[in-house]
Amino acid sequence: MLKRDLYYERIPTKSLRDDVRYLGNILGRVIKNQEGQKFFDLVEKIRLLSKANIANKNHKEPFKKILNEIKKLSPNSLFKLTRAFNHFMNFYNLAESIDASRTLDFYENVKYKKKLKNIFIEEIFENFFKNKKIPNNKIYNIAKSLNIGIVLTAHPTEVKRRTLIQKYHSLTEILEQRNLLKNYPSKLKILDRKIFDEVTIIWNTDEIKRSKPTPAEEARWGLAIIEDSLWDTIPKVYRRLNQIFEKNMGKGLPKNFNPIEFGSWMGGDRDGNPFVTAEVTKRVILLSRWEAAKLYEKSMTKLIRSYSMEKCSKKILKTTGKTFEPYRVYLRPLRDKLRKTHRAIEGYLTNNKSFNDKDLLLEREEILKPLRVVRESLEQNQSENIASGDLLDLMRRAKCFGINLARLDIRQESSR
């Protein structure tokens, strides 16, 4: 048996090593609690033999021992053993994403000369600015004209369930809280318990899809990716880009900067798929609009609760009349229209209840127009910092995702 844990020593950074070891210990406790000491000992034995095999590549003995142990196992035990290591690798990936976020925070908050790896957006543009053969204005104009299309599609080999993707997302959020509260032992205990509970739920959840997903289910999977990840990521990416240009040129990118748009084949790819009918496509589009209305309504509610200011532009006062909360009064009709859209589409999707198009929010400009008025008012009243916060994030989301979150690409037949 190895005296040192060589597996963890191979992990590049201490913070990542600590997170991987922490999650590995939690998983071990859950396995022991759920499956018993005997199975836990089996997992540990295979783990230690695997590490010995990696450390002694010229010796075949550890690998032979692994094979001999596996040959003794019943199909059920082998399945559980596979799950244990599969979950560990998923937790490793999760720890890597948290460590990348931590590295990015360090990049943004500390001035240093040392080059960072894997911060690809910053690294690309920093290299551009260091190249004296390329004028800064040219880099700025290139960035302004960027046009990035990202297409979401359901791969037939994708077997991970949406519910587990959401569980990993929830676990990531708790771990990020834990990183912020390292100096608060009592709060750490609460979070440690939450993490143990989440890992227990994950261990007891079937992680494999047992039936082929319908086109509508594929679309829900894509929408879950947007809701759980991309919805918050897009504004952060734009902020990072903006900071790079402010640092190197003394000015940020235009406020209408929006190079990224999403498309989707889910519910629109009819090539060789007779189940994607016109009705299916219609329902997928409505499902996307339903999800979009829900996300925008949530963001609008947050904005309305925050904007208690009284000073505003004449343009807003002309609409609201005299009030102590002009921004709230001005934004509520948009929030209510989003809520109405969400409920009308939900009624159709769940009960086939018809709706009037007039009840729905029909284009992205219906969101952007009132938000622009609010932004202009804030800028006129010495509140540019507020205008550049949650409001700007919401406007960037509206430009990126529109009212359907992703454009639905229709493919009737592949040779066309």
Residues covered by each model-derived region:
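Often metal-dependent polyanion-binding catalytic scaffolds in large enzymes
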Residues: 1-416
